[in-house]
């Protein structure tokens, strides 16, 4: 994502759908420390290896970890998929140092694809894709489904908003395809009409 110099002003939007949690977090953490600005969308579609029951048991064990005298002091147990991913990245960054805090500030995480980023080209990370990293037939579960099982209440809302966004995107794509056909047809008609005049203009690359 980032050049060897570690300087890249451009913000990279990563589509987290069907990426493995730890592998994606490690790549994102490294690039954040190198100076890259990163936005991660569709965090609810991130995959975890292991079945849902197993992952839920692990998370319930994590929920029991707290400070006896004052539980609000920590650890903080995030339920939202975006915050779980953010916390995973934070664990791979020296976030208590100035450099680490600045790196973490360059990360934005979202469920779904909010409006500023739905019109920006999204990237994937091949090193973290489920189809390349998880053995065929191996059990896995989605982070959004796990979150909904342990107290996150917006899974259905995000799914509904995502369906609406996909419908809008499909309508835009169909319109663009139609305009492309009309343009090709108009160019063909103009080519037939102009004929020899185009041969005159060709040397000057008009």
UniProtKB/Swiss-Prot annotation:
GO molecular function, one term: structural constituent of ribosome
A GO term from the CC aspect: large ribosomal subunit
Pfam families in the record: Ribosomal_L13 (PF00572)
Domain of life: Eukaryota
GO biological process, one term: translation
Family listed: Belongs to the universal ribosomal protein uL13 family.
UniProt-recorded name of the protein: Large ribosomal subunit protein uL13z
Organism whose genome encodes this protein: Arabidopsis thaliana
Gene behind the chain: RPL13AA
């Amino acid at each position: 994502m980032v050049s060897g110099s570690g300087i890249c002003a451009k913000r990279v939007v990563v589509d987290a759908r069907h990426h493995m949690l730890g592998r994606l977090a490690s790549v994102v953490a490294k690039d954040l420390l190198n100076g890259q600005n990163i936005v991660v969308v569709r965090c609810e579609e991130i995959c975890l290896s292991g079945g849902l029951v197993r992952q839920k048991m692990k998370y319930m064990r994590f929920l029991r970890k707290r400070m006896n005298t004052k539980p609000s002091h920590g650890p903080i147990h995030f339920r939202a998929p975006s915050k779980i991913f953010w916390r995973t990245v934070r664990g791979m960054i020296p976030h208590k140092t100035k450099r680490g805090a600045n790196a973490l500030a360059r990360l934005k995480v979202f469920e779904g694809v909010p409006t500023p980023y739905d019109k920006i080209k999204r990237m994937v990370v091949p090193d973290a894709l489920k189809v390349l990293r998880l053995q065929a037939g191996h059990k896995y579960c989605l982070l959004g489904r796990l979150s909904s099982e342990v107290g996150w209440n917006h899974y259905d809302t995000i799914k509904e908003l995502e369906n609406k966004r996909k419908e809008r995107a499909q309508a835009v794509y169909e319109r663009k395809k139609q305009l492309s056909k009309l343009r090709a047809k108009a160019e063909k008609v103009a080519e037939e009409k102009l004929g020899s005049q185009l041969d005159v203009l060709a040397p000057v690359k008009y």
